[in-house]
């Protein structure tokens, strides 16, 4: 499957979620309304692009004539390297699905993120580990979070004060990342809830 743009991924996710919730795909008008397109024609162009990339099929003559070709996997999605500026759960970032009970983590894990680097080694998060992440923006100071600064994603301990966020490493060889909320784009992707190493929950 060819990589999707961020906007195409939004359209794909909307269709998938709509089918999951209602049992049928959305109309072009519904896609346009939900995603803020000016007209159903704009939605149609995105559908054609998705069809060219092989993730869906357009069935002519039906307002809901959309069939997804990417089979839904079971298990927790495993996210590998994240390209700058793209959604964390974009289809092209998912390396596969891990068969693990999400309920073994508290709160439950929504996805696994492959750790890159040793900046959190002092608390047992090592390069190559799979970090279990609960997707939320409701986090507190002192918690280990998956954060996005501008276009980059990182795992660090959160310390927020006023308009400044410090993302603290757990390795003395690394320096804290300081974010000025007045000048930089910052968001929380989720809360770290556990680690899997070599197939075993730690």
From Swiss-Prot:
Catalytic residues of the enzyme: 119 (for autocatalytic cleavage activity), 156 (for autocatalytic cleavage activity)
Binding region for DNA: 28-48
Keywords associated with the record: Autocatalytic cleavage, DNA damage, DNA repair, DNA replication, DNA-binding, Hydrolase, Repressor, SOS response, Transcription, Transcription regulation
Molecular function as annotated in GO: DNA binding; serine-type endopeptidase activity
Its EC number(s): 3.4.21.88
Source organism per UniProt: Enterobacter sp. (strain 638)
Presence of the UniProt keyword DNA-binding in the record: yes
Protein name as it appears in the record: LexA repressor
SUPFAM superfamilies: LexA/Signal peptidase, Winged helix' DNA-binding domain
S-S pairs: none
Family from the record: Belongs to the peptidase S24 family.
Catalytic activity field: Hydrolysis of Ala-|-Gly bond in repressor LexA
Role summary: Represses a number of genes involved in the response to DNA damage (SOS response), including recA and lexA. Binds to the 16 bp palindromic sequence 5'-CTGTATATATATACAG-3'. In the presence of single-stranded DNA, RecA interacts with LexA causing an autocatalytic cleavage which disrupts the DNA-binding part of LexA, leading to derepression of the SOS regulon and eventually DNA repair.
Annotated site (Cleavage): 84-85
Gene that this sequence comes from: lexA
Keyword Transcription on entry: yes
Assembly mode: Homodimer.
Pfam families: LexA_DNA_bind, Peptidase_S24
Gene Ontology BP term (one): negative regulation of DNA-templated transcription
PANTHER family per record: LEXA REPRESSOR (PTHR33516), LEXA REPRESSOR-RELATED (PTHR33516:SF2)
């Amino acid at each position: 499957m060819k990589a999707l743009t961020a906007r195409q991924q939004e359209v794909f996710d909307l269709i998938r979620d709509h089918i999951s919730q209602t049992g049928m795909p959305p109309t072009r008008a519904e896609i346009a309304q939900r995603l803020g397109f000016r007209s159903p024609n704009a939605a149609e162009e995105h559908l054609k692009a998705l069809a060219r990339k092989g993730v869906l099929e357009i069935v002519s003559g039906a307002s809901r004539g959309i069939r997804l070709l990417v089979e839904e996997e079971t298990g927790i999605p495993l996210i590998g390297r994240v390209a700058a500026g793209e959604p964390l759960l974009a289809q092209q970032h998912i390396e596969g699905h891990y068969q693990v009970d999400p309920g073994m983590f508290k709160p439950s894990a929504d996805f696994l993120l492959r750790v890159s680097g040793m900046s959190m080694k002092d608390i047992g998060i090592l390069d190559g580990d799979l970090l279990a992440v609960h997707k939320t923006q409701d986090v507190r100071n002192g918690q280990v979070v998956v954060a996005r600064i501008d276009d980059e994603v990182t795992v660090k301990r959160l310390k927020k004060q006023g308009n400044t966020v410090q993302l603290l490493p757990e390795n003395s060889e690394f320096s804290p990342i300081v974010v000025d909320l007045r000048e930089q784009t910052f968001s929380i992707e989720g809360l770290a809830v556990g680690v899997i190493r070599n197939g075993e929950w730690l």
